[in-house]
């Protein structure tokens, strides 16, 4: 190895993120609850557009990757270069339905935002083999379907459609020459405080278990097939599932790096971040660090920290190995 190679600075990897509120670091409009007190009280000390008291999954992922914080699509979507990657995720986004003027573009629309930037010649040269693309999906389509009291018999077809759309979007990202393409598994929806409240936060609602299990089973098959196709065609692309389902369950069973007194109960209860006639429509705990969940759906900063401590070496290897 020549001296010039030894002196050459390491190429800093970039992170490109697509998804929903589990990944959004500030793309939603200022009238959403993520921009209202008490969101952001732990970090940065004020609302920042994150659906949390502080740092979220995207922030911890970039630390593991050794990347700088990605630009927000909301503020940098028209920039000529993406030297720090970009976060296209919007809180409230789903996989399937999104009207043309929706403030919450669905995940396919988000991926197409990047495609448009590439076609405009503003990104292509900025994507390198060390860069990572991530699709973060927390089941917005399923939660909406369940909350609308739609027939349970239709869930199987919905899951199949959602997972197939995830597959298509991963293929599109592969076509943009990403070598590392990650997707999250689906967290245990029935263990979210919005559903555990029915049991006074004592147990998960098992009625959602079947759809979560089916989603993750189909996703594993899709990712395995994509990796096999990549191997056969010698594309040197690696598709990877960030298994937050297992991490959620591990932490909630008190086997993670942080023990929470009641991991099914949220710190901010009620309509977090909302008020009426000057009065708060929520109650807030004294110490968010002692809670796994921040609100009815989203983990606290400490919750996300525990999740990423469980994810450990397999995730680090995928993100950092050439």
From Swiss-Prot:
GO BP term, pick one: lipid catabolic process
GO molecular function per UniProt: hydrolase activity, acting on ester bonds
Top-rank lineage group of the source organism: Eukaryota
EC class name: hydrolase
Database matches in Pfam families: Lipase_GDSL
Keywords: Hydrolase, Lipid degradation, Lipid metabolism
Keyword Secreted belongs to the record: no
EC number: 3.1.1.-
Transmembrane segments: none
Catalytic residues (UniProt): 21 (nucleophile), 295, 298
Family: Belongs to the 'GDSL' lipolytic enzyme family.
Protein's recorded name: GDSL esterase/lipase At5g03600
Source species of the chain: Arabidopsis thaliana
